Amino acid sequence: MQLALTGANGQLGKTIQQQWASAPISERYELHPFDKQLDITDFASLENKLSASGVSVIINAAAYTEVDGAEQDAEARRLAFAVNGDGPANLALWAKSSGARLIHLSTDFVFDGTASSPYREQDATNPLGVYGASKLAGELAVAKILPSDSVIVRASWLYSQYNKNFLKTTLRLMVEKDSLAVVNDQTGSPTSTSALTHFLFNIVCSEKGNGIYHFSDKGVISWYDFAAAIQEEGIKAGLLEKSIPISSISTAQYPTLATRPAYSVLDCTRAEADFACTTAPWREQLRQVIQCIQDRD
């Protein structure tokens, strides 16, 4: 069977490809990775490439992820909604016409962060900015067009050894700077792309599940906590030579174009129950990803 991966050059796409060969899924599916050569905003182009590959499952990891960039101007907003809203709709339309299954990646940014307990899949959405609104548009399109043959996976605070993310940026700044200031009033759960990849493989191979699932590593922390842990683990692994002072600041002291949710914790109970999986502690996952970075260096 054939599986198409969109967004193959993103951090999740790279992780999926890196783990593919050693995973049991590779014995059942042939992977077709697509990045910019597959324009998900152009249905005709998408149809030609996917039909030629005989695809029966799609993992849509393609996304416009510039949270602040999406707020800059009308063109940025248009691009965000084209990639994050129209793109998933096109994939769902093609999947419906061809009998394929679609697994679509989404985000905690569909929520406004005003909750006081972990968000469940059925909780009301209320995105605070363009990025979250565009991702919600994609969710709604997929659910409407392909209600029984789609899975939407919301993940929070995604990071990996690849590309640009909080972990990689923090490690770089800890080498370049004498001190760091990180917000302490935004709370959530990190998600390593490695753990998320295992969950996605589980969804594909089980051939069950539909609707929305939440997935993250286990534990609740602030961005400040995450930065402090990155420094500790980075020093242990030899990626950092010394520690630097890390200041704990409020969101108000670090203004950005886009408003971030203050609380982004996701309830993963449904994912754990339906797919018999247990999410791993975030610190354990962080240690593994840092080890991967050390091995690459």
Predicted regions and their residues:
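N-terminal Rossmann NAD(P)H-binding glycine-rich loop of SDR-like oxidoreductase domains
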Residues: 1-22
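Active-site loop of classical SDR/Rossmann-like NAD(P)-dependent oxidoreductases
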Residues: 11, 223, 247-268, 281
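Rossmann-fold cofactor-recognition segment
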Residues: 32-42
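NAD(P)H-binding glycine-rich loop region in Rossmannoid oxidoreductase-like domains
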Residues: 40-83, 96
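Catalytic helix-loop patch of NAD(P)-dependent Rossmann-fold dehydrogenases
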Residues: 75-90, 110-153, 157-158
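NAD(P)-dependent short-chain dehydrogenase/reductase
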Residues: 140-188, 193-202
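Mid/C-terminal beta-alpha module of Rossmann-like enzyme folds, strongest
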Residues: 199, 206-256, 297
